Amino acid sequence: MPEATSAGREIAIRTGGRVRRPNSVRLRRINILVGALSIPLFVCLWELVSRSGTVNMVLFPPPTVVAAAVLEWIRSGQFFGDLLASLFRVTTGFIIGGALGILLGVLTGQFPVISSLLSPLFHILRPIPPIAFVPIVILWFGLSETGKLFLVVWGVFFTVWLSTHIGVQKVDRGLIRAALMLGTPRRQMLQEIVLLGALPYIVVGLRTAVSISFYTLVAAELAGAFAGIVYRIEIAQQNLQTGQVMGGLAALGLMSFIADRLFAALAERIVWWR
């Protein structure tokens, strides 16, 4: 019995204090295997359905045709130019919208007067989708990059503002009062108590905004562009190049997925105590 107990303790220590049961380990491996096979199975099913004759291959091309269209897109030299144009719009819009969202979220969350002034307006504007602004953005900015960035900033800003606003309001008011009573400068109090306390909410809002920035990219490039992934999708659709349309959609989805994974890894380092 003592030997069994000591062995159990050793296993617990090696697994971080938790004894992993064989069933849970097996289930985890099965889940990983299923996840790894899901995409290949989907691609195979797609290929079979497309070539079965039950659908029009021109409108629903198989993955092999889509892959060939993407390779041709890359060989033409246009792909990387389109990729960089879209990434520039997403990244710049995300940075500007995120920074404005955090700044105004802290102000409206911390100061009731500013909240009373701005929050009603923001709540009215927030539900308006960026694509609804495409006609007026073209009138205001023409086909310049400013209009495209405006649309991405619009989509990112309200998501980050709302999460920051809620996060700041969730900070313990007792800590703030105690810090001010002890003579802590207001700027230091905002940085070390308010911002730090709201940080988990801010990070969640920013991660959500990563995906939203790609949604709004569609509206931005439909507002008139001469390069970009969505622009190329639109041109391919007009020429009935369905393979390139689907290839562009796949590229857009992959870009969004990679950006989300990278931000999730960064978020784990930023909010390490959660």
Which role fits each region the language model picked out?
Residues I138-L139, V168, Y215-L252, V271-R274:
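Glycine-rich helix-loop "coupling/hinge" segments at transmembrane-helix boundaries
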Residues M1-S38, R261-R274:
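Transmembrane alpha-helical segments of polytopic membrane transport and secretion proteins
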Residues P112, Q169, P200, V204, ...:
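C-terminal transmembrane helix and the adjacent membrane-cytosol boundary/short C-terminal tail
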Residues S163-G205, I229, I233:
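Short cytoplasmic-facing helical segments at TM-TM junctions of multi-pass membrane proteins
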Residues F150, W154, R186-A220, G247, ...:
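Transmembrane alpha-helices
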Residues G16-R28, R51-I96, I235:
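Periplasmic/extracellular loop-to-transmembrane helix junction in inner-membrane transport proteins
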Residues T92-F122:
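Transmembrane-helix boundary motif in ABC transporter permease subunits
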